[in-house]
Swiss-Prot record:
Its EC number is 3.4.21.53. The gene is lon. Residues 610-791 form the Lon proteolytic domain. This is Lon protease. One of its GO terms (biological process) is protein quality control for misfolded or incompletely synthesized proteins. SUPFAM superfamilies: P-loop containing nucleoside triphosphate hydrolases, PUA domain-like, Ribosomal protein S5 domain 2-like.
Length: 791
């Protein structure tokens, strides 16, 4: 519904007005208007389209003078109103004309006669109908009335009245010639530049002098707002003028500085850069590019552009073009250096010696990319540093954990604000040689998804056929990486993309045995901690038996990081006792170690091993090396369902279904009643439920636990097993046998069952572990069942 209005002085005589009021019905239809507040003495024109309002207009025509009640909503909304949202004060209006316009709407002209108060809503459909009472104007002191209206008119005339009122045509003439104060008041109210919702107070106020007083208040608020707006505009104008002035002065100052000093400084920089370009052994094409950029820098007057060009030239000239470090050519010295810094790790050391031997023989850098894979704490990162030291090369380390932007590898294009070179060339710059040992740490922790794929950017870096012309986006020129010895590290090879794995030579760095840890602790870690804490081996005495006790009862890890922290704690407590208690020597033994480290964190699992029903020790290969994977099975009355818990992956779940299907198919041979599967539900649980578990190698363990639970046979203590099971009961090969065997030995097991196909991998298991374990190869699950149960 659209509204238009024309502010008019009432043209009815008092007699005509009273005659009309005598004919008004006590119940009238209602039209709800929006956008404007109706005030008496106003001529309204409204476009009506709502069906219910059209019916209300039709109903009004049945009374003598076509009367309706006009109401507004509390929020002046355009939506169809609810009764609760209608104002209780409105106006009585008379329809003067009703003209049909296109689209079926009507343009209706109303004359506003008097204020009314709604008494009761009588009906809602098909149109709104109300009973009402007229709001009669209450008159106060005539002297006060005249004084107030005079003050209002003076206030309006004091300022350009267009600032206070709207629709100013004939406004002044009307209020000057209108004899009735009430009419003047209503005309001013309607024209005041205030929100229509604020005008509602005038509609419900019956006392004339109060209405005039409200006008004075609103005019005062408008005047304050106008003054505030004028002050704000002046401040904005002043700020703009000051900014323009400041900009002008700064630009002028730049020009003066350029003429006086900056110009000389820039010329000095240009001469210095030109000299560097001349002395640096750049390839011809790159030297030409550098001189072109220098020419651009010389002629550029824009500070932003000059800054980018200067950064580019600085980086280009900081790169070690053709600069190499002298490699160590004595294999015996290289081997000795590696052995002095790291215990064990023979496979990696042997590979580095081969690399050095080939380089010495061919006088060329072998194109090899090594990837050290193993659990945390086994020395992968520190070994890379030792390799650099043994070969006589610089060492650069870049951690790739959490890296997700390709630009971190290749760099940003110089068109971007804050562009920087990638990590590869930044590392080469820091090394100051083109043949460093470059460690790409945690390559399995790259963030790779449909949005990010930094692994693809590494393909060019790690491909010997491509990295001779590696292109960094920031440098925009090829750089030779063929002399760099790249070494990557990873905890879990499955997380490394296949394309990257294909470009690297994988070398497994396995978990340490107890013997390894004792040697590392006594020969390396303890000496390091004694030095770090300012004491000697006479101040802190700890023998190998105590170190073994620490390994078994205070650590549970594939590497030696926790062991190193424990030795550091013992060193700190020794220093404290030496200073406070004036001791010269602290001897740590298995009997007093709890005094310094507290109670044992891990019990000896060998003491915990008992004969159990439905519980078998599996062997797992995780991010952190090998570990035990207990499998528990129970069953209860049900409908033959299989319940799997312990945060299992899809492959592990399939192994459980396969094991159960094999047992169902062979229940007669196993001495199991077939009805037990239909009458019971089976629950398979792998403890430590918060840790995700997956893989096929638990099939043999699940099958053994199921048979034990169903037949109520005890499983011998000290057993562990690993292997994938098929529906025929065959046991297939698994990975990570070495890590699993070390974990079994560390956990106190004495016998493990492994797939027959893994016999070839037994040689990889350390001799001391092989000697302590009874390793039984099996090709079918029946071979396991015949040996694991207590007879």
């Amino acid at each position: 519904m659209k509204t238009k209005s024309k502010k008019l002085k009432s043209d009815l005589s008092i007699g005509e007005f009273e005659d009309i009021f005598q004919e008004i019905p006590e119940q009238l239809p209602v039209v709800v208007i929006s956008e404007i507040m109706p005030i008496p003495n106003v001529d309204f024109r409204i476009e009506v389209s709502d069906n219910s309002y059209l019916k209300a207009l039709k109903e009004s025509e049945t009374n003598a003078n076509s009367f309706v009640i006009l109401l507004t909503q509390k929020g002046l909304s355009h939506n169809k109103p609810k009764l609760t949202n209608l104002q209780r004060y409105g106006v009585l209006a008379q329809i003067i004309t009703k003209v049909k316009i296109p689209h079926g709407d009507f343009k209706v002209r109303f004359r506003i006669l008097q204020r009314v108060k709604i008494d009761k809503f009588l009906q809602k459909e098909p149109f709104l109908k109300v009973s009402y009472e007229k709001v009669k104007t209450v008159y106060g002191s005539i002297e006060e009335e005249k004084a107030l209206i005079k003050l209002v008119i003076e206030k309006i005339m004091d300022k350009p009245f267009q600032l206070l009122v709207q629709n100013t045509n004939n406004f002044l003439d009307i209020i000057k010639t209108e004899p009735e104060t009430e009419n003047i008041t209503d005309i001013i109210i309607f024209n005041l530049k205030i929100d229509d919702l604020d005008k509602y107070k005038y509609l419900k106020e019956s006392h004339l002098n109060k209405r005039i007083f409200y006008i004075l208040q609103d005019i005062q608020s408008l005047l304050i707002g106008l003054d505030l707006e004028q002050k704000i505009n002046e401040k904005v104008k002043q700020s703009i003028d000051e900014n323009q002035k400041e900009f002008y002065l700064r630009e002028k100052m730049k020009a003066i500085q350029l003429e006086l000093g900056d110009k000389a400084k820039k010329e000095e920089e240009i001469a210095e850069l030109r000299d560097k370009i001349k002395k640096t052994p750049l390839p011809p094409e790159i030297k030409k590019k550098a001189l072109q950029e220098l020419s651009r820098y010389q002629t550029s007057s824009l500070m932003a552009e000059s800054f980018v060009i200067k950064n580019y030239l600085d980086f280009l000239l900081e790169l070690p073009w053709g600069k190499t470090s002298q490699d160590e050519n004595d294999l015996v010295a290289i081997e000795k250096s590696l052995n002095n810094q790291h215990y064990g790790l023979q496979k990696v050391k042997e590979r580095i010696l081969e690399y050095a031997a080939v380089k010495i023989m061919t006088k060329k850098n072998p194109q090899n990319i090594l990837c050290l894979v193993g659990p945390p704490g086994v020395g992968k990162t520190s070994l890379a540093s030792s390799i650099a030291k043994a070969l006589g090369r610089q060492f650069v380390r870049q951690s790739l954990g959490g890296l997700k932007e390709e630009s971190e590898i290749r760099g940003h294009r110089r068109t971007y604000i804050g562009a920087m070179p990638g990590r590869i060339l930044a590392g080469i710059r820091d090394a100051k040689t083109v043949n460093p040992v470059f460690l790409l740490d945690e390559i399995d922790k790259l963030v790779t998804n449909y949005n990010f794929d930094p692994a693809s950017a590494l393909l060019e870096v790690l491909d010997p056929q491509q990295n001779i012309n590696f292109m960094d986006h920031f440098l925009s020129e090829p750089f030779d990486l063929s002399q760099v010895l790249f070494i990557a590290t990873a905890n879990y090879l499955d997380n490394v993309p296949e394309a990257l794995k294909d470009r690297m030579e994988i070398i497994e760095v396995s978990s340490y045995t107890e013997k390894d840890k004792i040697n590392i602790a006594s020969k390396y870690l303890l000496k390091k901690q004694l030095k770090n804490h300012g004491i000697t081996d006479t101040n802190l005495v700890i023998d190998n038996d105590t170190i073994l006790y620490l390994i078994r009862h205070y650590t549970k890890e594939a590497g030696v990081r926790e062991l190193d922290r424990i030795l550091a704690e013992l060193a700190r407590k020794t220093v404290k006792e030496c200073l406070i208690k004036k001791k010269e020597q602290v001897i740590i033994t298995t009997k007093n170690v709890t005094k310094y480290l507290g109670k044992e964190k891990y019990l000896n699992l060998l003491d915990e091993q008992k004969e159990k029903i439905g519980s078998t020790n599996g062997l797992a290969y995780t991010y952190f090396g090998g570990d035990l994977l207990p499998v528990e099975v129970t069953y209860y009355k049900g409908k033959g369902q299989l319940v799997l818990t312990g945060k299992l992956g899809e492959v592990l779940k399939e192994s459980a279904y396969t094991a159960l299907s094999f047992i169902k198919a062979n229940c007669q041979n196993l001495g199991i009643d077939a009805n037990i599967f239909a009458e019971n539900d089976f629950h398979i649980h792998l403890p430590e439920a918060a840790i995700p578990k997956d893989g096929p190698s638990a099939g043999i363990t699940i099958a053994t636990s199921l048979v034990s639970a169903i037949t109520q046979k005890y499983i011998k203590k000290g057993l562990g097993m690993t292997g994938e099971i098929t529906l025929r009961g065959n046991i297939l090969a698994i990975g990570g046998l070495k890590e699993k065997a070390i974990a079994a030995n560390r956990s106190g097991l004495d016998t493990i069952f492994i797939p027959q196909e893994n016999l070839k991998d037994i040689e990889d298991i350390p001799e001391e572990v092989r000697n302590k374990l009874n390793i039984i190869p099996v090709s079918n699950i029946s071979d396991v069942f015949s040996q694991v149960f207590v007879v």
